[in-house]
Amino acid sequence: MFKINIIHQISKKIPTSLWVFFLFAIISLLIQSSEIFEKGFVLGYDSVFHMNRFYDTMMQIKTGNYSYFISLFGFQQSARVINAVYDLGMAYFMGFILLLAGSWLKFQLITSFLVNVIGAFGVYRIAKKCDLNIYLSFLIGCIYMTSTLTMSWNLNGSFNGIGNMVLPYVLYYGIEMMTNKKNKFSIVGLGLSMGILLQTHFFSSLLVTIALSPFIIITFISCKEKLIFVLNLFFSVSLSILSSLNVWLSLFHITKNNIIIQTAPRDLMRNAVFFQ
């Protein structure tokens, strides 16, 4: 009885969010259990492309031979410009995880676990911000974890899953600016989360910008202190640009100085079907 009381007292001191995070971790391990026990790497349609990217950054970290633009180790050492225009920040983070993991199987298990848990917890925070109870919020997080939005990384090696891991943390501040009585939101939170998303998956940052637009417009119309709201938004945008400045400079530099061939030359009209 004494031991039960001690456990009960300890459990009360642990924050609810930590318990939720722990439960998400257990569910993620259950989802990944077949891969853990079978010890088999899941090779998706995008896996080889990203494996080359991360192997390149991993070897750069390991050897100390860094190259911002060209691929020194990946893509058959072809000197292709990939990571500089494809989310360089996350590429180096993934390369670091690969270096620590030591194998592709461990790398996939670790990254899939992080995508599942972090993404689910982000959606849980949004649900709680919308005043849903803890059980419903947890359920929504579980649904998000098992949806194609995050599972696309686990099963297909698609980087959309990585972007969808970060996306809820940006969208959270759209909810915050609408639900707050004075229409206040965390300037640093919105700016840094968007900056991290820009370093993670550029297309996801475009999607979340579109998703945030209605929140911004409605909040601007309804708020009384419009100038303060616009200034706060300006500071957040500035912070997100500064925290992802390398992304913008890379795109500008390559686009401006590329005189040999277009980055991705495609004649879309040649494969189109015309009806007369």
Give the residues covered by each predicted segment:
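Start-transfer (signal-anchor) and selected internal transmembrane alpha helices
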Residues: 1-34
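Alpha-helical transmembrane spans of integral membrane proteins, capturing the lipid-embedded, hydrophobic core
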Residues: 21-29, 113, 117, 141, ...
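Active-site lumenal/periplasmic loops and adjacent helix-entry segments of GT-C-fold
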Residues: 30-130, 135-168, 172-173, 196-197, ...
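Structural signal for the C-terminal ends of transmembrane alpha-helices
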Residues: 30-34, 173-180, 214-225
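Hydrophobic cores of alpha-helical transmembrane segments in multi-pass inner/ER membrane proteins
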Residues: 166-175, 207-215, 240-243
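Short hydrophobic alpha-helices at membrane interfaces in multi-pass membrane enzymes
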Residues: 176-195, 226-234
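Perimembrane helix-loop-helix junctions
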Residues: 207-239
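Periplasmic/ER-lumenal interhelical loops and adjacent helix-loop junctions
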Residues: 229-232, 237-276
